[in-house]
Regions:
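Beta-strand->loop->alpha-helix junctions that form or flank phosphate-binding loops
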Residues: 51-54, 90-94, 227-247, 296-300, ...
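Residue-level detector of alpha-helix initiation sites
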Residues: 11, 73, 111-115, 275, ...
Length: 445
């Protein structure tokens, strides 16, 4: 019996453990942190051996194959030992892909992943297809393959997940864009991060499709290096030669594999960045074969994604918008670009090698104030203090929202769009967004 060790017992690790057990492997799960009770119960229910708070090196190094949580960097000591030994290390997605013939619609990119993924799932589900949502959002792909298999999966993939995928094949691959992000995990080398994102195209055949933003200079440059066999499906904001998705004369248009159009005004998502998300999603659904009536309806009634330009409400005359998912500078740029009122920008957190020059002009144009929110705000002071905009320095969400109240005038918008990861002060991005929403709503009580 082959031995599989799973490092990390979160959503992906626990799910992979269940599938490995079902497929007859000897399974051992190890997590350096404390494992959540629901994942302990899931593993106990399937008689899976696990440990928390430490790694039993002897057991781990005895594995025939290791499934690694995407949150564990390759520099981790245990990963280094496994690599030195030559033990294969894969991702949960790679493992799950071995045990299903379902059609895989996979989405990656520095920005827009979650919105595009959620929109595709919304449309395909509305069409009555047997579809699962997996990857960065939804349930573990491996757990679904083991217990509730579907004919289609819509999967949001981070660069960390793609790093350990080798034979997995995306039937429809979407690359929304590539901008600097997570460079701390890629030796601060942009090419390393780019190579990870481009892995979404690996193993594609003539039967598959690759959807990408035609105006992304990095993607178009990279494409010249790859001899892709899949159908190339570029999209752009306006009609360009070769593009099969675009906006023209106030209409949203798709030209592959069938012609589709609808009034742009009918689209539920607003803002330039959401034009790109909607074009990518529409092309994927058109390729899958969704009927045009359902496609039109899905693009029209999609409710949006929590923590992504989420309107919290208007309190004491000030609008509050939660964009906690904006964990890089590019995402913040799109958020600021969509603002139509004077904006108090909340920015800060765990910096991932950010270059803030990209947003300085927009900050000067749109912002009436900036509130820094992080354990260490020095880099923000160095970048923004000289712009001549009022700034405040805070280290908790409570103090941050209080500072926003002080700076904002009726009619202004307070925008949480941090450019950074959340782990310095919060459990995760969702915790940051929930705290912001709760404190904003308390203003109106």
């Amino acid at each position: 019996m082959s031995k599989i060790v799973i490092l990390g017992a979160g959503e992906s690790g626990a799910g992979a453990a269940v599938l490995a057990k079902k497929e007859g492997f000897e399974v051992f799960v190890s997590d350096m942190s404390k494992i959540k009770d629901n994942y302990k119960k899931l593993m106990d229910d399937h008689n899976i051996e696990w440990e928390e708070g430490h790694h039993t090196e002897e057991k781990i190094l005895d594995a025939d194959e290791v499934i690694k949580s995407p949150g564990i960097p390759k520099e981790a000591p245990m990963i280094q030992k496994l690599m030195a030994k030559g033990t294969p290390i894969i991702s949960e997605i790679e493992f799950a892909g071995r045990y299903t013939d379902a059609k895989m619609i996979c989405i990656t990119g520095s920005n827009g992943k979650t919105t595009t993924t959620s929109l595709i799932y919304h449309i395909i589900k509305s069409a009555g297809y047997d579809v699962g949502l997996a990857g960065n959002i939804g349930k573990s792909l491996a757990l679904q393959v083991a217990e509730t298999p579907h004919k289609y999966y819509v999967i949001e993939l981070s660069s960390f997940q793609l790093d350990n995928m080798y034979k997995f094949r995306a039937n429809v691959a979407i690359l929304r864009n590539i901008t600097p992000d997570h460079l701390d995990r890629y030796e601060f080398k942009m090419q390393n991060y780019t190579d990870a994102k481009m892995r979404i195209t690996q193993n594609q055949t003539e039967e598959d499709s690759f959807i990408f933003w035609n105006d992304d200079p990095i993607v178009t440059k990279e494409l010249a290096k790859y001899n892709l066999k899949s159908h190339l499906c570029p999209f752009s904001e306006f009609k360009e030669e070769g593009c099969v998705g675009f906006i023209e004369d106030g209409k949203y248009k798709l030209n592959f594999p069938s012609d589709f159009e609808m009034p742009q005004a009918d689209m539920s998502l607003r803002g330039k960045h959401n034009i790109y998300n909607s074009l990518a999603a529409g092309l994927a659904c058109n390729i899958v074969g969704i009927d045009h009536e359902t496609l039109h309806k899905g693009l029209s009634d999609f409710p949006g994604v929590e923590h992504r330009l989420e309107k919290v409400g208007k309190f004491q005359g000030v609008y509050y918008v939660n964009d906690s998912k904006a964990t890089n500078v590019d995402a913040c740029w799109y958020a600021l670009e969509s603002m139509t009122t004077p904006t108090i920008l909340i920015i800060g957190g765990k910096d991932k090698g950010n270059d803030y020059n990209q947003i300085k002009d927009l900050v000067k144009e749109k912002c009436a104030g900036i509130v820094y929110l992080g354990a260490d705000n020095q880099k923000l002071h160095d970048n923004f203090d000289a712009l001549g905009i009022p700034v405040r320095d805070t280290h908790s969400m409570k103090d941050c929202v209080a500072a926003c109240q002080e700076l904002a005038k009726p009619g202004d918008t307070v925008l949480l769009s941090p450019c950074c990861a959340s782990f310095d002060l919060f459990k995760n991005m969702e915790d940051r967004g929930e705290q912001f929403k709760a404190l904003a709503r308390a203003i109106g009580e």
